[in-house]
């Protein structure tokens, strides 16, 4: 099954300290897909997609495990650094899923509204306190028109890559 191969590839992604600080929700229910299509800028292709994966930054599982093993001792709540690692883990896994899909001719689209409509999606997926949906990956076989579509132009590397330290945009770079 190609979807399982995609999920397996996602799970093999590099992860901070091998902690796997993310979860993947495989959305199969058509009613949920329909709600996602509406909550994410009314994009009907979401509801029609054969594969919809939600990548969740997930520190809840570790927090629960720490509480279990610590018994009566107080457990440290996750902080900003923990969530940044969880975000990174989730996004790296999502990108691995994209590459795996592309290797099988399956296209993908990242949907950022999963973050923008956080409260709605938290409730829709029954997400606990120390979790955040960070990426929705909608996957399927591209229509012929999509195959011919030109890829959007990306920034030139001189606007993205700095050497040894961060470079601010100066007037010259902005005007270029």
Give, region by region, the residue ranges found by the protein language model.
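Acidic, surface-exposed loops and disordered segments
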Residues: 1-176
């Amino acid at each position: 099954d190609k979807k399982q191969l995609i999920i397996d590839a996602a799970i093999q992604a590099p992860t901070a300290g091998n902690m796997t600080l993310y979860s993947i929700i495989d959305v199969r229910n058509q009613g949920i897909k329909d709600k996602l299509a509406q909550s994410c800028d009314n994009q009907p292709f979401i509801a029609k997609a054969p594969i919809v994966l939600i990548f969740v930054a997930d520190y809840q599982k570790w927090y629960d495990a720490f509480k279990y093993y610590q018994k009566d001792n107080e457990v440290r709540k996750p902080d900003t650094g923990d969530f940044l690692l969880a975000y990174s883990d989730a996004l790296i896994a999502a990108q691995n899923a994209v590459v795996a899909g592309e290797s099988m001719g399956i296209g993908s689209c990242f949907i950022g509204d999963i973050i923008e409509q956080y409260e709605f999606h938290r409730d829709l997926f029954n997400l606990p306190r120390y979790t955040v949906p960070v990426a929705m990956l909608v996957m399927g076989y591209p229509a012929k028109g999509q195959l011919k579509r030109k890829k959007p132009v990306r920034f030139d590397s001189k606007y993205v890559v700095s050497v040894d330290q961060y470079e601010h945009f100066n007037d010259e770079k902005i005007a270029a």
